[in-house]
Structure formats: structure tokens, C-alpha cells
Amino acid sequence: AYQPLGRNAPPEVKNTQWIRNGIDNFVLARLEAAGIDPSEEADRHTLIKRLFYDLIGLPPEPEQVDPFVDDRSPDAYEKLVNRLLASPRFGERWGRHWLDKARFADSDGYEKDNPRPDAWRWRDWVIDAVNRDMPFDEFTVRQLAGDLLPEAGPIDRLATAFHRQTLTNTEGGVDQEEFRVAAVKDRVDTTGAIWLGLTVGCAQCHSHKYDQITQREYYQLFAFFNNGDEATAEVPTSDEATARYEEAKKKHDAKSA
């Protein structure tokens, strides 16, 4: 698995008219090897539904379909793609994937599962980062150590709430140190999984059987996260964002009452 990445030249294909970019070469080469012809190009009604579901996770409104179907300009498809990429819904759709991997939730978990009223602030930071097309290296640094950046501001510290997405036990009488250590372990495991793509957690009890991670290395990483404190910081947000949250919360509470 630990092989350096190489740059492979796109394979040659017979049906060169079908090719629009280098990725198509790889797809078509496999299809031709299997004796399979590519599917016919989808009609406009199918295309707009696919684009909406893929890019923003929502179906198109009826009044959005006809203008695209009737638009016969050669760049109609590209214009629709750009419009959906510029939509705030794009960040909500694709930021959801990162939020899931980072174990985001609006409540603490465990038996009490108390609500986290300010959890949405980090969620919205992720969504905004996706919508602004933040470079992945910057996206990484700000979440892992945004508070250590030169002249770090409140938003930089907010990004590090990635580390606060662990389960929190607020039940009375529990051993807080036990659950603090469990939270640190969760940070190690999650960081290894989503940034390294490795099951780092296997090395908690023994050196990894398959990946090149020793038990000693696991606890070296554990020691790094064990130095952090779960400090509470006031993070200012715009009045507009706060108003949107309060309005959405009222609607949610009314429906679930």
C-alpha cells in the first residue's frame, strides 16, 4: 500500500470522439476491453436532476427545469454547473461528508446526550470553507492547530473545534479522567482515519498488524493531543447567521413539539 504516487499517461482508445478529458480515457479503455459501449448521452431532464442531486443534494424546482431544457446554447451545461457550484447549498451538501467523518453532532452522546447549542458554529465554518474553496492544506492546518497560527483570531480558534467533536459525558458521579482519556483516544483515531486514511486505533493495544504504525508511535501521537485543554471560547458570528440559526431552531422545535 505504501507506494509513491506516479503520473500515468492516459491510455489510448479507439473511440476518440467520446473523449473530453484524460479521465475519460481510463474509463473508456476499461469499457472497450470488456466489449461494452458507453451509454448514450442523457437527456436534459435527466441531466438537470443528476446535477442538482450531485452538487447540492436537492431536486430542481419545476420552474428551474424548463429554462435549462430550452437553453440550446453550447455552454448550457457548464453554466448550470457553475451556478450550482456558487450556491450556498453546495457547501452544505459536500461539507456534510467531512462533518460525518469528523463525527459532528448537535449533542454530547452517552446516556444523557445533552444538546450542544453552539455546535452549529463549527458546522457552519466547515460549510463556509467548502463554499470558499479553501485549499485543503489550509483546511487541515486550521482545524488541527488554528489557534497556533501567527496572530490567530477567533475564527482560527473556531476551526479547532474539530477536536471538540468527541462524545462528552456530563452525568454526575462519573470518573471525568476516564472520559477525558477516551476523548483523547477518539481524537487520535479520527485524525488518523480522515487525514491518513489509516486505522491508527489498532495500535492502541499493539503495533499494527498491517499498517506501518507501532504502539509507541500511537502514544507519541496520543501525547500530542493529550496536551490540549478543552477551553471554552466566545466566537463572534454575524447577526445574520445568528438570526438564521434562531429562526431555524424555532421551526425545528415547533415541528418536534
Pin down the residues of each PLM region.
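Short, structured secondary-structure elements
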Residues: 1-246
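Long, charged, low-complexity terminal extensions
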Residues: 248-257
